[in-house]
Amino acid sequence: MKTIGLLGGMSWESTIPYYRLINEGIKQRLGGLHSAQVLLHSVDFHEIEECQRRGEWDKTGDILAEAALGLQRAGAEGIVLCTNTMHKGVHAIESRCSLPFLHIADATGRAITGAGMTRVALLGTRYTMEQDFYRGRVTEQFSINCLIPEADERAKINQIIFEELCLGQFTEASRAYYAQVIARLAEQGAQGVIFGCTEIGLLVPEERSVLPVFDTAAIHAEDAVAFMLS
């Protein structure tokens, strides 16, 4: 079994499911008392979020690259970045850390392609929904068209993520709002929906979505398990 290095804490609410899902995957594959060989570097999300708001993406990339190098020195054999949004800075990690990097958009793209879909809705932070680092990769590498909510919906989705979900607050009102947005995107022809923020799956259970759900945290964790046992 390879040792996986997790870059977490963005937010820590969604890092917990990564640890659980990876261990469950290892136990399911190997049985008995087997558990995952995991190293975790959890960053201070306050600093990361401030850099995001100021547009200081190079600084966030430096922080994560240094964390990845620390995991490499500690014995990690691959890197998993437990957040969608911070994949915007993946170039900094890949250019300075020689370990295999398991990109969350690649894992998600493979899952969508495997389900036979080419047109899906994308929910996430405003950075993930509006910028090209995530949508562009999914489109270019997997020929998947991502539909995003309207501007006012994107603003509210983003607000809920940072002001509620990242603080561990999960309300029925926000759950219903997300379900409403998903239903509207389904009417526009979306075949499925990407939960492109690792906290969204903590808020919206699959049964509340009219579309098949691609929960990026679960998909990414499954990809990590496959890598660890390869």
Language model: regions and residue ranges:
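Non-catalytic structural scaffold of enzyme domains
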Residues: 1-230
